[in-house]
Amino acid sequence: FKSNGDLYFTDPPFGLPGVFDDSGKAPVQGVYRLSHDGALTLLINDIKAPNGIAFSPDEKTLYVSDVDPKRAAWLAYDVKADGTVADGRVFFDAMRWRKDPFFGPDGFKVDRKGNIFGARPGGISVIASDGTLLGTIETGQPMSNVAWGEDGQTLFMTAGSSIYRLRVTTGADRY
């Protein structure tokens, strides 16, 4: 959610036959905004497998993870005053961690400093707001998502068969 109540969400192709080919998939895998007044808008329609989504702390940048096996990356978009987005770009290339078509950058959260804690095969990447890799949390498993705990400084990380918990020195921007 954006602070004004607008809901931004992705509609990935997961669960459809032929996820990463053209057979049996929905015509658009996109990023949408459901405004607080109920209007639904397709904002981005050129991402093959949009997945995780989050805002920078100042809400001027929208981040989206793309699990496309040919372009696994976290993407960044400028958020305009009217809530639409522009100037999409690769924020961080995650191809080095792609293991197979179903494991690329996945769910993520942004901390109060604007750093991304992003799930990916083998662990979590911590990426600064300028796109620099700050570090990694290696788990050896394909990670699926992260969430902040109630205290805002505990990071929960999910994998296929495990849940990890780690206290971090930074903290949640929002829950």
Outline where the language-model segments fall.
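A short loop-to-beta-strand structural motif that recurs across blades of beta-propeller domains
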Residues: 29-32, 73-75, 123-125, 162
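Beta-rich, blade/repeat-based domains predominating
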Residues: 1-7, 14-15, 25-30, 40-61, ...
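Short coil turn/linker residues within repeat-based beta-strand modules
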Residues: 36-38, 81, 130-132, 170
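Blade-level signature of beta-propeller repeat domains, shared across WD40, Kelch, NHL, RCC1
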Residues: 145-175
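A detector of repeated loop/turn-to-beta-strand junctions in beta-rich toroidal repeat architectures
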Residues: 24-29, 71-73, 85
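Short loop/turn segments immediately following beta-strands, especially the blade-tip
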Residues: 76-85, 167-175
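Short loop/turn segments immediately following the C-termini of beta-strands
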Residues: 12-14, 67-69, 79, 121, ...
